[in-house]
Structure formats: C-alpha cells, structure tokens
A protein has these predicted regions:
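Short linear sequence motif anchored by a di-proline
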Residues: 1-217
C-alpha cells in the first residue's frame, strides 16, 4: 500500500455514504501532489478518526480535467438547476438519459468528472414497506472510479451527479440501479481524453464481483 493510500485512509473512515479514496498511478506524480495538498488542507480541519460522510449537498473530492491535465477539486453532490423554483435535486444521472437527450449528453461530454470510491450503499426492498441497508464493495478492487458530470450554477459553483446504469448480475437482487464503474485501467486513464462515443460505450453494468454486508439501521 502506498504512502498516499495510507494517508487517505487516516482521514476518510471506511463506513461512509460514498467512501472517497483517491489513489492514482504512481507515474501521475503531478496529480498525486495535488491530492497530498488537498489532504493536508483537510487535516487542518479534521481529526484522523472523524467520519467523512459524502452525502447529498456535501462538497466532496472529485477528479476533473482542463488544459493543464487532471486535478483534484471539490464539488457539491446534487444538481439544482433553479433554487428559486426549487427544482428537484439531481444526484444520479441515468446512462440511457445521457445517451438520448442532447442536454445531458453535452454535459457528459464537456463537464465530465470521476468520483473515486471504495464502496457504496444500496437499500434492498424486503417487503412490508421495509428496506435493508446494504454495504457494497468490490471483491478485487479496493478503489474504483465512477463517471459523473457537473453543472455550474449562477454563483459559478459546480454541482455534480454520478452516472448510474442497470444492475450487474451480482447486484440485481439488491437494487434496480447501480453506479457505473469503470472496470479496467485504460477506461479510467483515458476517460478525459476519449471521445464522447467512446465514453458512452463505457456506461454499462460492471462485471466486477462484489462483497455485501447488511448494515444495522
């Protein structure tokens, strides 16, 4: 385990809504330096044992891209297009909607991001209007990356949603949707430079095996 991974683990608790950990390939030294700076800044405001809950409307770290390359920044999870009219908060963007509707397709093309995770939670319907909270991690990957897109609001602040797709064969008994997970390294490393069509083709259920754990309510 790299020093970067250990440092991240000292800040971010394992059991969080979407568990954020950023570990990039060693050759991407510039990005690792940015991550280290971000962590050091957060350490000024957090105790090592404090839980970092990435829930709706929170600012969380994401990976973005501009002419200077990849970089770490914080964006608010949840897009609200019109706060005055109180339009619904959009925290997930469906893959089929992105593929069919020009507005969402353009956002995904021009404003794409990656959200690093170590796991996520889903709510399984167990009948009688009851749901069971399930913790989901990947069997062979400690860290994985989920595509997302962002919108810049009237104040110039960026808000994002993550991209979801149909459930994999491993998740279908738990929930009818799941985050898109980029299964291979090339999909992650080329995500910001691949064409729109190439990235749309990546929006599909993951083939990675999962480990599940029932959580106490």
């Amino acid at each position: 385990m790299s020093g970067l991974s250990k440092l991240l683990k000292s800040i971010y608790n394992e059991d969080i809504k979407i568990k954020i950990l950023d570990e990039i390939r060693k050759e991407e030294e510039n990005l690792e330096e940015e991550i280290e700076k971000e962590i050091e800044e957060q350490k000024k405001h957090k105790k090592d044992s404090e839980v970092y809950d990435a829930v709706l409307t929170h600012n969380i770290p994401v990976i973005a891209y501009d002419e200077g390359g990849k970089f770490i920044t914080e964006m608010k999870w949840g897009i609200m297009f019109d706060p005055v009219k109180k339009t619904p908060l959009i925290f997930n963007s469906r893959d089929d909607t992105i593929g069919m509707k020009p507005f969402w397709k353009n956002l995904f093309d021009k404003n794409r991001i990656l959200i690093p995770m170590t796991g996520f939670y889903e709510w399984k319907d167990i009948g009688q209007k009851k749901k069971l909270k399930i913790k989901i991690v990947l069997k062979r990957k400690e860290i994985f990356f989920v595509p997302g897109l962002y919108w810049k609001n009237k104040e110039g602040k960026r808000e994002f949603s993550l991209v979801t797709t149909s459930p994999s064969r491993f998740l279908i008994e738990i929930h009818n949707r799941m985050p898109v997970i980029l299964d291979d390294d090339d999909s992650v490393l080329n995500y910001f430079t691949d064409s729109l069509e190439e990235n749309l083709a990546k929006l599909k259920p993951s083939q990675e095996e999962i480990i599940t754990e029932e959580m106490q309510s």
